[in-house]
Amino acid sequence: MGAIVTTEMADGSGHTRIPIVGLQIVVDRYVEYLREDLATSRKAAEWVERNIIRRSNRELVVAVCCDSGGRATYIDVVAKGTVNCCLASVVEIFKVAIISNAVNIILFHNHPCGDPTPSAKDEETTKRVREVGELLDIGLLDHIIIGSDGAYYSFMENNVAGGSPDGA
């Protein structure tokens, strides 16, 4: 998803801006594709790793905003960090959720070191996101940490502070 395409222009700049309408089509296809792959934490983690986080050498936090059926309606990278930490603002997470009219969110972030084991800070952040979400009536369906070689950690699958199978 890029905003600039290289082409030969009369002014010699070599760049053409894509109209915002064109970008919306790309975002819609992106979200539509993700809807098919959110069935399990593993599939969702694989999709986000492959299409958004890739092999980033920095921690990224991604919010997937969902409708009442758990289908993705909006995706955003809400924070970019360093090689071993990322300060994800709960305000930024919920700003994206509110603007997109999300009923639920799924958080993803990567550990560039490859080990998806959550840190105490990861657990604290997940708990705080769940608590703020309860106040705003926006559920946290899961928080998934992506490691390397397909390794991931799902708070929901592990019934830890941020997630449980019933969303409570």
Which residues does each PLM region occupy?
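Active-site-proximal loop/helix of nucleotide/amide-processing enzymes and allied scaffolds
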Residues: 2-26, 34, 67-69, 79, ...
